[in-house]
Amino acid sequence: MGTNNTSNNNGTTKKMSLEEFLGNDTLGESVWDEEDINLDAISNTTNIDILKQTKAGEHQRDGHQQHPHGGHGPMNRSRFSNAGPFGGGSMGDFANHHHPLQHQQGPPYIVKFSDLPPRFSNFDIEDLFQAKFTKFIKFKLFWEINKNPSISTLKSGSIFDQNFKRDSKVAFVELYTSRDMDKILNYWTTPLKEIYHITTAPAEFEDFKDYSTKVKLLTDPKDDAGKPFITKTQRSKSNPFGSAKPVDTQSKILDIEEKMENLHVEDTTTLRASLIPSSDSMATTATGSKITILKKQTPTEEESHSATPTPKPLSYSEVVERSVVNETSKKGTPLSKLDSPALELQSKPDKSDEFKGGDEQGFEKGGDDKAQLDVSNDKDKGSETDVDKQFTFKNVEREHSMSRTKYNGNHNNNNGNFRGSNRYRGGPNGSSYKGGHNNRGNRGGYRGGSSYNNNNNNTNDNNNNNNNSSSNNNNGSRYHDRQNNEEGLTSDSSLDASGNKKNDFTNSTSNTQQYSIFKPASGFLGQGNNDSIRNNGRGNYNSSGMNGGSRGRGFGRGRGFGRGAYNNRGSRGGRGSSGNYSNYNNRTTDMPL
């Protein structure tokens, strides 16, 4: 057996294939017999202490008393020689290679972090170890010790300045195991130094005691190293204006305003004089400058007497009266006062409605003679009452309705104007008589008054009842008819012996009809006779010849019969409640509305 081994060692080594190795029976028939393997020994956990004792026994038995790398530990052996569980002591050899053996002696395992910035705090230490997934037992922050203080600092400096510096801090961290310490020293040192300028090294216990002793001298809580210390640097602002200074204009303005209030004057020359120094002001006052204050001149006696007195405020009735007068004057209605007292209207003894008050207007009597009307028309005077007195209206039950003027057919064309003037709406009307040579009727009077137009153009031009008229026409009469007249007045036309038309105004009550206050346009209800048409408001009675028709406006603003076919066109009706009434001749009949 020994000769074979020597021959094999001396000769070339024969390589065995896998088949030859499996078929070799040199080590026994069942090399891979599972029964020969102790499974209990494999399942047991290997104890590090047992391995250490085993290795120590082997070293003592072999007579090796010194570590191969020269490291000496207590009891003449290295502390980290067999620290690794995997044998060989490689972890301990690597640690001893980088650091002296005296720093690795037993717990506590403490690492020192130096050159920390002043803002470093307890939170930053915890954050660092949490980021690296490393646990620690405890830590302590200190200010860096001032090892060489200056003489001035030792004499006049504070306790903190004599022992510590505020430029940097140090931290001592105690770890659980030596593996954590080796990890920090091997893998954290270079990044922390390059990025944060932090130095990492194993801590010495004597150094830790020195820091702990000096920190007890600090009593001010502001000197706690565990809190961040941030120096407040005041930045000096650069003046954008350089050496220039802003001008104080506000004080000057306030000074000027104060002087203006004291002087109570707005004269700029006086203000300037007040701003001049005292020496200059004396010179200016010596020249005799005076302050002139502008005031409103009081009026003299002559001007005060010549000035018109302030008019008194007008009452409501006076304002209404003036407005009515202005309107009538604009329309060109002649208003003439009577020299004689107003004539009273003849009335029957059984009249039920009458006008009471100082503002009464007289009506011309209706006579049998047409010459009387012509004379009154020639005088061109209307009755007018005193307007300064108040007008009152007594509204009693009426037996007679308002007067209606009825005009039957005639053989002539009569042209007349009737334009009523109404000082108070709904009051009596002042009438005027004005003849004219018109083939066309005119508009009616003011609201509440009735108009009567009568065309009397004589074909022979030989009958002129108006003595003062220079026209070739028979002037019609102008007549105002109140909507609430005390009597019903009718106008009947007839022919005299000479063939001329004769207008007779008589008092008639046979054709009267009850008037409804709530139905001012009661004729609109369909009554067919001529009396149903009430001449209220501004309506006109237009008659234009034998076959002519008038284009009057009916009840409200409706249109009447239409434009005449043969003769002149009728005049426009008013806005009152009455419409226009057209008559052709004696033989024509009135058309119902």
Swiss-Prot record:
UniProt-annotated stretches for the region Disordered: 56-101, 227-248, 280-593
Comp. bias regions, Low complexity: 408-426, 449-477, 534-545, 578-587
Modified positions (Dimethylated arginine) in chain numbering: 443
Skewed-composition ranges (Basic and acidic residues): 56-65, 347-402
Biased composition (Polar residues): 231-241, 280-290, 486-497, 505-516
Keywords (A to Z) from UniProt: Cytoplasm, Methylation, Phosphoprotein
Subcellular location, principal: cytoplasm
Keyword Cytoplasm (UniProt): yes
Sequence ranges of Gly residues compositional bias: 546-563
Keyword Manganese: no
Subcellular localization, as worded in the UniProt entry: Cytoplasm; Cytoplasm, P-body; Cytoplasm, Stress granule
Chain's role: DNA polymerase alpha mutation suppressor. Suppressor of group II intron splicing defects of a mutation in MRS2. May play a role in mitochondrial mRNA splicing.
Name this polypeptide is given: Protein PSP2
